[in-house]
């Protein structure tokens, strides 16, 4: 019969007498508190993957300074990492998230931290960018098996479907809660293969969760969960997944109008994808380099990156594409991406004639993507195609068609719980503003303003 563990109450860590203990990382004080509440040295050690002797040494004055050990102790006893200065606490993180704008120093520090993790070193700077994980009431199994790993993979699939069909806002809260539970399984007993598979599944889940935060407009939380995913993927030695995460970090940078920073993330991703021998992921990274170059107005670089993407797509075995890359090979998705690239070229072009030529190409690709798309393609992606189509019809002076598509897609975007979808409607508004002599265009602008002012703030950040 398995012995019942003593009480563990996560509300302990909110008590005033424990705050200085946690803030000073006084592990002896933490262990002493646990002992006073019925925990033996052996039980503490089993929870933190330490021997009874190591626990005894700590209680007798040995200091714990290693970040990974401190993190393990915090997670094992459900101590919010922020209380121990291991990551921002939920309150301080919310304060920092009021603006998604980072200082130039923040951006340099984050880029350096990502590069450090990408090359296999999780240093103190990287740990500062990890998320505060939600506490979970449910206990995790003491010993995990393949079925526990399959549960995480299955939940990843289900939340990913919700995210793609209804937007990140439909998935993010429940997904964050489940991850707070599932992440604790990393301290459970398992054989080496199962432990590695769990890390891969947790990394994929955290990447999906980061993408959902990205979609609702919370780039700060997206950055933290993607960093968390990258740490796990590197620890599990899964370079294809690491490449996918770096692609997503690149898209976060682009969402914040930082294409040069995005290129750095994507180039790190290329190293991981090539290490994995994964042409599918290499292709997606090249395609997104094209989008970053479009934001910089570098047409020749765009064409080169798209050509490289198509070459790698031709090499990829579509029957063996990783689950985190599958969507990219859905019919219509790459064509929709090309539409987005030409939409950006048009938006950033300084020459009006050239901007119109790019807009014509964007219309062609958007229409083609809509035609190619089947039920397997993300509903959100199809909505984005229509936003690109409407924007560029208006840019090419096809006013009636542009307004008609816009009215339909505004309704679609309002149904989606996607901050990206709502923010992209602004491009329709910018294009419509050039037709101020048209009553239809003016009505469209009023409709867009109404959507902007009534949308939930969490989705318009």
Please provide the spans of the model-predicted regions:
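A short, Lys/Arg-rich alpha-helix, primarily the initiator
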Residues: 1-39, 71, 82, 93
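Recognition helix of helix-turn-helix/homeodomain-like DNA-binding domains
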Residues: 49-65
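Compositionally biased, long intrinsically disordered regions
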Residues: 85-150
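Conserved binding/catalytic microenvironments
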Residues: 4-5, 16, 136, 140-461
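Helix-turn-helix DNA-binding elements, focusing on the entry/boundary residues of the two helices
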Residues: 41, 52, 70
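Short, basic-rich loop-to-helix N-cap that marks the start of a DNA-contacting helix
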Residues: 62-75
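Short alpha-helical "recognition helix" segments of helix-turn-helix
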Residues: 43-46
């Amino acid at each position: 019969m398995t012995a019942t563990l003593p009480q563990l109450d996560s509300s302990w860590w909110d008590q005033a007498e424990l705050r200085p203990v946690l803030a000073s990382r006084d592990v002896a004080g933490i262990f002493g508190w646990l002992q006073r509440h019925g925990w033996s040295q052996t039980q503490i050690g089993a929870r933190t993957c330490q021997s009874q002797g190591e626990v005894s040494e700590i209680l007798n004055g040995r200091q714990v300074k290693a970040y990974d050990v401190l993190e393990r102790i915090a997670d094992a006893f459900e101590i919010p990492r922020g209380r121990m200065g291991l990551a921002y606490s939920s309150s301080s993180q919310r304060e920092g998230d009021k603006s998604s704008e980072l200082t130039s120093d923040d951006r340099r520090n984050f880029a350096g931290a990502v590069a450090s993790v990408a090359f296999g070193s999780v240093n103190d700077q990287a740990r500062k960018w990890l998320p505060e994980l939600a506490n979970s009431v449910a206990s995790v199994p003491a010993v995990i098996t393949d079925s526990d790993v399959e549960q995480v993979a299955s939940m990843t699939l289900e939340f990913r479907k919700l995210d793609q069909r209804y937007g990140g806002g439909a998935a993010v809260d429940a997904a964050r809660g489940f991850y707070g539970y599932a992440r604790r399984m990393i301290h459970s007993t398992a054989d080496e293969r199962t432990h590695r598979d769990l890390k891969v599944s947790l990394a994929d889940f955290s990447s999906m969760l980061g993408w959902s935060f990205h979609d609702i407009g919370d780039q700060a939380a997206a950055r933290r969960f993607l960093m968390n995913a990258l740490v796990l993927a590197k620890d599990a030695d899964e370079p294809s997944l690491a490449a996918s995460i770096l692609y997503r970090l690149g898209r976060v940078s682009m969402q914040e109008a930082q294409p040069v920073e995005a290129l750095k993330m994507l180039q790190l991703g290329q190293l991981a994808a090539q290490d994995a021998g994964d042409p599918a992921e290499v292709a997606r990274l090249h395609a997104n380099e094209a989008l970053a170059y479009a934001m910089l107005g570098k047409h020749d670089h765009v064409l080169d990156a798209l050509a490289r993407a198509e070459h790698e797509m031709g090499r990829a075995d579509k029957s063996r594409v990783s689950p985190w890359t599958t969507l990219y090979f859905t019919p219509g998705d790459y064509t929709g991406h090309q539409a987005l690239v030409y939409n950006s070229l048009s938006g950033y072009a300084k020459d009006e004639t050239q901007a119109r030529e790019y807009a014509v190409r964007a219309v062609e690709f958007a229409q083609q993507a809509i035609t190619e798309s089947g039920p397997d393609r993300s509903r959100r992606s199809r909505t984005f195609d229509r936003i690109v189509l409407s924007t560029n019809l208006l840019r090419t002076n096809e006013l009636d068609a542009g307004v008609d598509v816009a009215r339909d897609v505004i309704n679609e975007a309002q149904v989606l719980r996607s901050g990206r979808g709502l923010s992209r409607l602004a491009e329709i508004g910018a294009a419509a503003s050039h037709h101020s002599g048209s009553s239809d265009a003016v009505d469209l602008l009023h409709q867009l303003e109404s959507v902007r002012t009534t949308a939930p703030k969490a989705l318009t950040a």
